[in-house]
Regions:
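Short, hydrophobic beta-strand segments
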Residues: 85-92, 172-178, 263-273
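Short, acidic Ser/Thr/Gly-rich low-complexity loop/linker segments typical of extracellular
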Residues: 75-84, 163-164, 255-257
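Ser/Thr/Pro-rich low-complexity tracts
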Residues: 108-207, 274-276, 280-293
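Beta-strand-rich domain onsets/edges
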Residues: 25-52, 114-117, 207-218
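Short amphipathic beta-strand segments in non-cytosolic proteins
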Residues: 60, 68-77, 156-159, 247-249
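Short, ordered, surface-exposed loop/turn motifs in non-cytosolic proteins
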Residues: 50-52, 61-72, 148-150, 230-231
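A short glycine/threonine-centered beta-strand motif
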Residues: 56-61, 133-146, 224-228
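Surface-exposed, proline-enriched loop/turn segments that connect beta strands in immunoglobulin-like
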Residues: 40-43, 73-74, 124-128, 206-210, ...
């Protein structure tokens, strides 16, 4: 599979430029160094005794094979050639934690009983109203397949990649062919399908001065939103606070201006010393009942 672009729309400004931070691909890769495996995608809801799929991303955002995942109940497994791993959820309901071996931090998942997860047909209970073209996003409901590849997700008539899954949750990467704007989304697996619903997909573009940042200099970074005239929430995070200060706090959330002509959100940094600064920007999108469902 051809390389895909960023999941989380993390925009990295390195002194003067914008570079894609996360790139995903499904083709087999050489196992990454332990320190390169950074992000564990574990379905937030799994079902006792039933299958689920997790995924691991490396430092460049690619799906990472050969990475060991350890669970708080003592179980462990490794991702396969696609950077994912199929596993059976523990029998005991409750919270379980997973972590990448050799990396700090852990991710939680709630184990529900089969009775709690049962439904006569596939249903969607929560999905984002807005997502970015390059971000992964989550869909919650019932009746999905635990094997990620058994789920068929289409967005605007294009196939999407299911990164992680359980009967109750999907983590989806939009197709590269998708254009900004509203799109219909369908989900099906094992001869079950959910009613079609809509998600607005936006493209985030950076407009910034390309000259080096100097100590005491104020620099405005403007994020342009394409695909909607609505105000959307963006979060900026300063990843190099010793080099520059993000005015307004760290992290800082801001609504875009909204509008048909120009939908923008400005962020300002102040140089503390000459050097490389890193600012990440991500869309903040709440989950809710899907539209058109």
């Amino acid at each position: 599979m051809a390389a895909r672009r960023k999941f989380f729309f993390v925009a990295w400004w390195i002194a003067s430029g914008l570079a894609p931070a996360l790139v995903a691909q499904q083709s087999p890769l050489a196992p990454p160094r332990p320190t390169a495996a950074r992000i564990l995608l574990l379905p937030r809801r799994i079902v006792s005794g039933e299958r689920a799929t997790l995924a691991v991303l490396d430092v460049n955002g690619r799906l990472a094979p050969g990475v060991t995942i350890r669970f708080s109940n003592g179980d462990h497994l490794s991702t396969d050639a696609t950077g994912r791993a199929l596993f059976v959820a523990p029998l005991n309901p409750g919270v379980i934690f997973g972590s990448i071996e050799g990396r700090p931090g852990r991710v939680s998942s709630m184990i529900l009983t089969p009775t709690e997860a049962s439904a006569p047909s596939m249903e969607i209970s929560a999905a984002p109203h807005v997502a970015t073209l390059t971000d992964r996003f989550e869909v919650f409901g019932k009746g999905f397949c635990g094997d990620a590849d058994a789920n068929h997700v289409t967005i605007g008539d294009h196939g999407a990649l299911v990164l992680a899954s359980s009967p109750l949750a999907l983590t989806v990467l939009p197709p590269t062919e998708l254009e900004p704007g509203p799109a219909k989304l369908t989900v099906s697996c094992a001869k079950r399908d959910a009613p079609e619903f809509s998600v607005v997909f936006v493209e985030l573009e950076l407009a910034a001065d390309a000259s080096p940042l100097r100590r005491g200099e104020h620099r405005t970074l403007t994020v342009r939103v394409r695909g909607t005239s609505e105000k959307i929430s963006l979060e900026a995070r300063n990843l190099a606070p010793d080099v520059a200060e993000l005015e307004g706090g760290n992290p800082l959330r801001r609504l875009s201006s909204g509008g048909d002509q120009e939908n923008v959100a400005p962020f300002e940094v102040v140089g503390k010393k000459n050097g490389t600064f890193l600012i990440s920007i991500r869309l903040v999108s709440a989950l809710g009942r899907p539209e058109g469902h």
